[in-house]
Amino acid sequence: MTNRTRIIFRADGNSQIGLGHVVRSLALAEMLRHDFECVFAIQAPSQELQEQLKKSCDGVIILPVCNHDEERFIHELDAYIAEDVLVVLDGYNFSTAYQQSIKRKGCQLFCIDDIYGYTFVADAILNQAGGVKAEKYKTADYTKLLLGPKYVLLRPPFLEAAKAERSLPTGAVSMFLNLGGADPQNHTLQIAKALKQVQGIEKVEVIVGSAYQHLPELQTWLHHNRKYSLHQNLSAEEMCQLMQSCAIAITSASGVAYEYASVGGLLFVLQTADNQESLYTFLTQNGIAQKYEQIERSIKAGLPTAFEQAVTTQRQYFDGKSDERLMKVFCNMALATGITMREATSNDLMLLFEWANDPEVRKNSFNPNPILLESHTRWLHTKLEDKQAKLYIAEAAGEPAAHIRFEILNGKAIISYLIGSGFRGKGLGHVILQKGVAKLLQQKPELKFVEGLVQQENMASVRAFEKAGFSYGTPDPKFPQAHRFELHPQSIN
């Protein structure tokens, strides 16, 4: 993209709540940063965390400390967002009201979630845990759900590792131990002590993050146990290399488990927080990982076989292409963000003629016959002079993308629209309907009712009207087999 669309990532992280939301948001920023301007908004980050954010993002917005139950919390991004900005939220305090505040600015909104704790009005929701049913979520009609590890948020080294062959590391049998960036309950030390009794492990690589608060206690214990090595604040590259050297890992049921599974190896997981329950269940029930309690039995049964079986299963879920899938989603969202409406003119004659005669358009029209240029010319000139007709061209990045027309009579507008072939399949239908209606209301604020007729087999348009907030009305007697969609003033304003 020449003019990169701005994405504002909003997440918090510290020693109390951990760094999980920040880390996975940064993984997404790493995927998108070359095509988008990525800016991170956060409350009270430590100096170390600020430096980490700057490595992955183009800028950092340090927000004033504000509790989520304060009235001003839902407006904390107001000064930074407009309809040409994408917003990514990752955290449990970004409730429906917070999201609505962003949507009222006209922004495209993307939420990263794993607890489905409230109604979402986001344009897309990502839950990378496997086995999550769409029915768990209460969403707006237009919300797109991205569920499971095919959309996993991995940093670049782990995406590359997922594509590479993985074999059992040679030399001393090493274990990777990481229970999260903060680990407030100090599971790290508890597990490290327990591993002294496990036979067959020659080295233990212990990793903690910048928010870990128990470092002196851990260092004191490790000083007397030489097979343990301590690492802190590793980069993604360093973390990946360390994982590749370890045939075995113990992690929390969090993003780090997905990172190790993308590298490949014998993985054991521990649930260290309530919000890890669904991921813990998915990992252990599908053979991607085993429960921590099974570690001794599994190692005794034979490491080479267990390692190979684990990697084979993990490769079925992690193909290293989640960045490509997510890039496509964000490019479509950016396209929707940039949609503008202008009035059609006589200069659009041939453009509208070509669009109208597109085979796909004719197939879904109530009159499927080809349109002649002479009759099209008369029609356009008549409509442009008609005070009760409004014709708009939707443009994306300055390029004509769609046409939307309204026929107005007695406070009611009948809508008709089409999308150019190069812009189909990008999820733009509902955006064009919404922006077209908004443009019409600016010019005709007295409007009371909008309706549209859609052929039953035209599922793309049916879905677009549903996502745009239209409801099903009584069928039109002239076209009883068609869906009749309607939108009332209270739904519009």
What is the meaning of each model-derived region?
Residues 257-300:
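Catalytic binding pocket for nucleotide-activated donors in carbohydrate/polymer assembly enzymes
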Residues 301, 319-338:
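C-terminal alpha-helical cap of glycosyltransferases
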Residues 163, 169-245:
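Donor-nucleotide binding loops and adjacent catalytic segments primarily
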Residues 121-186, 215-216:
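A nucleotide-sugar donor-handling region in carbohydrate enzymes
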Residues 244-254:
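Acidic donor-binding loop of glycosyltransferase active sites
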Residues 9-16, 24-31, 43-56, 62-141:
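Active-site and donor-binding regions of nucleotide-sugar-utilizing enzymes
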Residues 338-351, 356, 391, 395-493:
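Acyl-donor (CoA/ACP) binding surface of acyl/acetyltransferases
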Residues 308-320:
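A short, well-ordered alpha-helix in the C-terminal region of glycosyltransferases
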